[in-house]
């Protein structure tokens, strides 16, 4: 314990930045952590896990489309008597602190210039791109922290302790996000290169392959479980099709949004066309700059002496980023409509920051004027990032985010729903949305009549949210017929489906 205290004392600036990042997360979640479609399932699975009901999602069916890692953490908090909000607040603050300290630690290992390390660490601490993750009940905060920890462990000398930690981290990465094995494989490949000096290339490759293989055993069991439930490995997915250039363009614009401190997170149809022009231009500029810096690095590698650790961290960070971008673009076209926006690309935020910091640090500015100019630009850039984050944190903390926003929570229809008896069973054409309001039990949709019929309850209600097709025609598909209307406004209606002893199917003749 004393060693840890001394370690932190020697890195007081980094500790201060980490605490500042954690404080921003606290402020951003002051009125409640943000809630979205994914959140409803994460929370429902966590509560059902804690109550011994299995890993059931918001609609009461076994979850396959998302791994259970975050949900289990929420469930553990529930078992300890903590609310969902408090559990996630604590988790996200811890993740923010780990991410900042881990970034600084990696830069120290690489022996980066003190000022460059401070700029990079401050950017990670105050970037709105990360704050937007810390202000939601999402899997990204723990995933980012796990990636940073895995990078640190990979750089350790080969040994049983390192191998055991990598197995645990690789498994954890998968159970937090399905994309975990992509990171595990990237890290295992680079770890093979790192460990070859001790074991030789063949033995190192076999060792790291064995680590990866062992970590995939629980992954295989989970995927087989999913296949038995719905015939898929990771839930139903729909590819976007088209060219690989389309998601790569979106990624470039996302990089630009990181520079402008204006993260973009949209729906599944988000594309390059939805980004402001300034983020597009800056994103392309960032990619060109990284390419030039990498080219310069390789051209001058024989003339500039780099430490082994610096080269290793650059190789590790670059490989993780490159493989994940390639995988994400391929997945978007061939497997899943998941645009390469801020949320999708945040796992490689730290690796990319490390790449830029390591490459720019190789250029030594001999002119005092240039050094002062670089310092002034850095201060302005970081100040802009910090002010943007503070503004976002205050706004999120005051108003909430998405379905946790006060405007959404206090809608008249939602106030009415919150006053319904707690032993009621609810149905809706938007069950995940309603779950942000009704967290007492599963919310079934209009096609889950068998589950609705067998649910233990006293009375049933259906909350129908009004919506239209693209041509403006009202969408009434699956709306119950003959149910009495007990509440109505412009957003929707609440229908009385009668006692739970009655046959619910009578409303869908």
PLM regions: where:
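Membrane-proximal lumenal/periplasmic loop motifs of glycosylation machinery
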Residues: 28-37, 51-71, 79, 83-89
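Multi-pass, polyprenyl lipid-linked donor-dependent membrane glycosyltransferases
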Residues: 37, 65, 88-95, 119-149, ...
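Loop-to-helix entry region of an early transmembrane alpha helix in multi-pass inner-membrane enzymes
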Residues: 68, 72, 80-98, 133, ...
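Membrane-interface transmembrane helices that cradle and orient dolichyl/undecaprenyl
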Residues: 109-111, 150-165, 173, 197
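Membrane-lumen/periplasm interface segments of specific transmembrane helices
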Residues: 204-291, 323-327, 384, 388
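Membrane-embedded, lumen/periplasm-facing catalytic core of multi-pass transferases
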Residues: 377-435
């Amino acid at each position: 314990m004393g060693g840890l205290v001394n370690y932190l004392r020697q890195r007081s600036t980094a500790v201060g930045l980490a605490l500042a990042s954690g404080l921003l997360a606290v402020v951003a979640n002051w009125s409640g952590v943000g809630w979205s479609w994914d959140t409803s399932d994460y929370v429902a699975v966590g509560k059902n896990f804690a109550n011994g009901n299995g890993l059931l999602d918001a609609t009461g069916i076994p979850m396959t489309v998302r791994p259970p890692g975050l949900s289990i953490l929420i469930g553990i908090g529930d078992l300890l008597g903590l609310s969902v909000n408090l559990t996630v607040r604590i988790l996200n603050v811890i993740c923010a602190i780990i991410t900042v300290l881990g970034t600084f630690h990696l830069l120290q290992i690489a022996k980066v210039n003190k000022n460059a390390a401070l700029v990079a660490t401050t950017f990670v601490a105050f970037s709105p791109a990360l704050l937007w993750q810390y202000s939601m009940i999402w899997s990204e905060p723990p995933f980012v922290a796990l990636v940073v920890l895995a990078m640190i462990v990979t750089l350790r000398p080969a040994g049983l302790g390192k191998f055991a930690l990598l197995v645990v981290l690789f498994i954890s990465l998968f159970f937090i996000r399905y994309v975990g094995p992509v990171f595990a494989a990237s890290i295992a490949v680079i770890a093979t290169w790192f460990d070859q000096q001790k074991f030789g290339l063949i033995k190192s490759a076999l060792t790291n392959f064995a680590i990866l293989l062992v970590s995939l055993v629980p992954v295989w069991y989970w995927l087989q479980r999913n296949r038995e439930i719905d015939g898929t490995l990771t839930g139903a997915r729909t590819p976007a099709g088209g060219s690989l250039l389309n998601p790569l363009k979106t990624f470039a614009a996302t990089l630009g949004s990181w520079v402008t401190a204006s993260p973009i997170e949209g729906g599944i149809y988000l594309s390059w066309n939805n980004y402001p022009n300034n983020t597009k231009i800056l994103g392309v500029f960032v990619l060109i700059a990284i390419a030039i810096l990498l080219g310069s690095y390789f051209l001058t590698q024989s003339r500039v002496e780099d430490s082994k650790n610096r080269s290793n961290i650059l190789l590790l960070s670059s490989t993780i980023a490159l493989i994940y971008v390639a995988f994400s673009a391929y997945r978007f076209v061939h497997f899943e409509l998941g645009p390469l926006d801020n949320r999708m690309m945040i796992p490689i935020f730290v690796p990319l920051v490390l790449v830029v910091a390591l490459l720019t640090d190789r250029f030594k500015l001999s002119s005092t004027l240039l050094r002062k100019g670089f310092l002034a630009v850095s201060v302005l850039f970081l100040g802009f990032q910090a002010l943007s984050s503070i503004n976002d944190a205050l706004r999120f903390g005051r108003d909430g985010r998405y379905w946790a926003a006060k405007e959404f929570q206090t809608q008249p229809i939602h106030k009415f729903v919150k006053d319904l008896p707690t032993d009621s069973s609810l149905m809706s054409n938007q069950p995940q949305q309603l779950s942000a309001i009704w967290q007492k039990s599963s919310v079934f949709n209009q096609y889950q009549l068998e589950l609705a019929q067998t649910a233990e309850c006293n009375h049933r209600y259906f909350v129908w949210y009004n919506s239209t097709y693209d041509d403006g025609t009202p969408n009434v598909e699956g709306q119950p017929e003959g149910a009495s209307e007990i509440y109505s406004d412009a957003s929707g209606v609440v229908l009385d489906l009668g006692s739970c002893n009655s046959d619910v199917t009578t409303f869908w003749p």
